Amino acid sequence: GQQAGLMHALFQAECAWLRYWDEGDAAQKAEALAGYRQVRALMPLHPEGALEDVGGYSADLLRSIDAMIAEAARGDGTTVRQHLLANC
């Protein structure tokens, strides 16, 4: 697709930052969350109705990522760990 390289790089960065968050103390978790927020800011929205080749993330997936970030910011790693197991 048009954004295949970007999507792959974002996926790798996402797994790295979430793993770093999961393995860290409070200071490392804060650093990891800041890094992951930068990755999230780069995630393009897939235009509704566009062909798959256009690339990007669905609005639903981006909302779930935002919810995972908020959960992690509260110190709850449940969804982070589920994401790591399922995707990384």
State where each predicted segment sits:
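N-terminal low-complexity, intrinsically disordered segments
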Residues: 1-7
